């Protein structure tokens, strides 16, 4: 009985064991349990080993277009015709920087994160930019877009100041104009388009006061009770539920649509003659890129996935999530034991019917056709996509440190060369005087090595655990999930072997005692039967 109690105590602990080495599988298991899927128990979770298709992209819902937050990154360039006006222009630039507390001035890392990604379902909203000499990020086909907004490719916004007092609070014009298919937008008189985030600075140019007559309803994405609205003065989207209060109009500081359109703009500042001469003088212009601040959300452009869109980008993009290729196999089928890279044991190949994870969750990728019934789908995409974003952030930190190292190297080279060349000017410069190569020490190289060493150690640790297989202690815990279904029959057989002889002996003695009792009763009955005894006459 003690062994039986021990098994009953340990069984829940073994069943609740997680896989810390595979966070995506753990997240998938939690999602299956939280959604009440029939595959939440007694199933296999398998990952794809293909490197050609790292995952699948799913579009965000119309409501998420109003809630996902973006951020802007600003860089500026002096006008090449600016001569002798650096001091007043620099003063104006410092004023402009103070006017944008929500803009980050450190440039992000651009480029696609994944390629060969397939978009599942119809994207509710797509944005198309066709700038000349722009950076192509990828193009989605029109067949996968429900509503497509096209940014005006010929618009150039250049702000001119005619009075000195305006320089203390410079303003940019409204975001670029966008066009849309005829019949897509309907005029709606509602105050939801006049809302603005209370936690953000209202001085930024994308928070210009809304025009009450420019609030348009996107008919393809709206229903009777729920509307998706577009404010054309700020390129902002709003989601309105007619049964709830007006506090729904609180939106992120920078909306996705506003950030995508601003990143295609050519923004500049010029001043008139009373400050800098007799004619209109351009001072500087800005390059603004945009990134998604909400973790787990990505720009989906064709088959490429981006975290940031560069300034002057071109292509057709939407926003969404990236989920890894995880498949489900029912637990009533036999699978080959996972080898995890152990080449000493043979691999078993057989045809197995796998079910995609999102199909097992009961989710249909139909977010592009409406705004109702998609909460569970959006939450699932976001949670799975966040695990990928965490890995990307780790690699981005290492790349950022490398970028800082290059900047530091350039600064040291320029500073030392200037100083040494001045001291050795008579000899033609330091390198010519020494007649050898000049070497420099970069003080941030240790950070790069530490980051790379940590990444290599993590990869090495995972590789060691994978090659050891079931021979190590951690691998033994993983094997419990395979042995657990056989625990019940094995325990029953063990109990039968332990207590079977005793039970058999008790049953045998009981049967023998009953047989003896019956035999004794039969003999007594036969000996006590009455007989007809006649008395003798004698």
From Swiss-Prot:
Question: Which residue spans traverse the membrane?
Answer: 479-499
Q: Which family is this sequence assigned to?
A: Belongs to the gamma type-C retroviral envelope protein family. HERV class-I FRD env subfamily.
Q: Please give the subunit comment from the record.
A: The surface and transmembrane proteins form a heterodimer. They are attached by non-covalent interactions or by a labile interchain disulfide bond.
Database matches in Pfam families: TLV_coat
**Record's Gene3D superfamilies?**
1.10.287.210
The record's section on InterPro entries has: TLV/ENV_coat_polyprotein
Query: What keyword terms does UniProt attach to this protein?
Result: Cell membrane, Cleavage on pair of basic residues, Disulfide bond, ERV, Glycoprotein, Membrane, Signal, Transmembrane, Transmembrane helix, Transposable element, Viral envelope protein, Virion
Q: Where is this motif: CXXC?
A: 43-46
Give the start-end ranges of region Fusion peptide.
Answer: 354-374
Motif CX6CC at which residues?
431-439
Q: Got any disulfides in this one, which pairs?
A: 43-46, 43-439, 431-438
Source species, domain of life: Eukaryota
Would you list which residues are glycosylated? 133, 146, 177, 220, 241, 247, 312, 332, 443
Task: List the ranges whose topology is Extracellular.
Answer: 16-478
Miscellaneous notes for this chain?
Ortholog of the human HERV-FRD_6p24.1 envelope protein. The genome contains a high percentage of proviral-like elements, also called endogenous retroviruses (ERVs) that are the genomic traces of ancient infections of the germline by exogenous retroviruses. Although most of these elements are defective, some have conserved a functional envelope (env) gene, most probably diverted by the host for its benefit.
The record's Gene Ontology biological-process terms are: syncytium formation; syncytium formation by plasma membrane fusion
Cellular component annotations (GO), alphabetically ordered: plasma membrane
Record's protein name: Syncytin-2
- What's the PTM story here? Specific enzymatic cleavages in vivo yield the mature SU and TM proteins. The CXXC motif is highly conserved across a broad range of retroviral envelope proteins. It is thought to participate in the formation of a labile disulfide bond possibly with the CX6CC motif present in the transmembrane protein.
Q: Where is this motif: CKS-17?
A: 414-430
């Amino acid at each position: 009985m003690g062994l039986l109690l021990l098994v009953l105590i340990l069984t829940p602990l073994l069943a609740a064991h997680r896989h810390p080495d595979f966070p995506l599988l753990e997240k998938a298991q939690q999602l299956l349990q939280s959604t009440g899927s029939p595959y939440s128990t007694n199933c296999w979770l398998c990952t794809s080993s293909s490197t050609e298709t790292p995952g699948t992209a799913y579009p965000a819902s119309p409501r998420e277009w109003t809630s996902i937050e973006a951020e802007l990154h600003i860089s500026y360039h002096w006008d090449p015709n600016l001569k002798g006006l650096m001091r007043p222009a620099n003063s104006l630039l410092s004023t402009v920087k103070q006017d944008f507390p929500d803009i980050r001035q450190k440039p992000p890392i651009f480029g696609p994160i994944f390629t060969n990604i397939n978009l599942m379902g119809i994207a509710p909203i797509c944005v198309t930019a066709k700038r000349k000499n722009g950076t192509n990020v990828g193009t989605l086909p029109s067949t996968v877009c429900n509503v497509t907004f096209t940014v005006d490719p010929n618009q150039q916004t250049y702000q001119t100041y005619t009075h000195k007092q305006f320089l203390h609070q410079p303003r940019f014009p409204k975001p670029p104009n966008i066009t849309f298919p005829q019949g897509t937008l309907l005029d709606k008189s509602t105050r939801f388009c006049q809302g603005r985030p209370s936690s953000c600075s209202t001085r930024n140019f994308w928070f210009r006061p809304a025009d009450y007559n420019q609030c348009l309803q996107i008919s393809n994405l709206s229903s009777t009770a729920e509307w998706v609205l577009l404010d054309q003065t700020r390129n902002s989207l709003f989601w309105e539920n007619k049964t709830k209060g007006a506090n729904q109009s609180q939106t992120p500081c920078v909306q996705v649509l506003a950030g995508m359109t601003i990143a295609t703009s050519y923004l500049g500042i010029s001043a008139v003659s009373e400050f800098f001469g007799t004619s209109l003088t351009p001072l500087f212009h800005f390059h603004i890129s945009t990134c998604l601040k909400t973790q787990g959300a990505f720009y989906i452009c064709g088959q490429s996935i981006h975290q940031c869109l560069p300034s002057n980008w071109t292509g057709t993009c939407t926003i969404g999530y990236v989920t890894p290729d995880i498949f489900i196999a029912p637990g009533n089928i036999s699978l080959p034991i996972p080898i995890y890279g152990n080449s000493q044991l043979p691999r078993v190949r057989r045809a197995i019917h796998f079910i995609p994870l999102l199909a097992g969750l009961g989710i249909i990728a139909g977010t592009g056709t409406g705004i109702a019934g998609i909460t569970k789908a959006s939450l699932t995409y976001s949670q799975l996509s966040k695990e990928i974003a965490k890995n990307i952030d780790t690699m981005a930190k290492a790349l950022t440190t490398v970028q800082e190292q290059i900047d530091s190297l350039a600064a040291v080279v320029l500073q030392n060369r200037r100083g040494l060349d001045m001291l050795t000017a008579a000899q033609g410069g330091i390198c010519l005087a020494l007649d050898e190569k000049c070497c420099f020490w970069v003080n941030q190289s240790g950070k790069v090595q530490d980051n790379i060493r940590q990444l290599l150690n993590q990869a090495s640790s995972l590789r060691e655990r994978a090659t050891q297989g079931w021979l190590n202690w951690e691998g033994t815990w993983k094997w419990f999930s395979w042995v657990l279904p056989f625990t019940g029959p094995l325990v029953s057989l063990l109990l039968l072997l332990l207590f079977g002889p005793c039970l058999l002996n008790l049953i045998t003695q009981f049967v023998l005692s009953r047989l003896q009792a019956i035999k004794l009763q039969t003999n007594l009955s036969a000996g006590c039967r009455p007989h007809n005894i006649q008395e003798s006459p004698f």
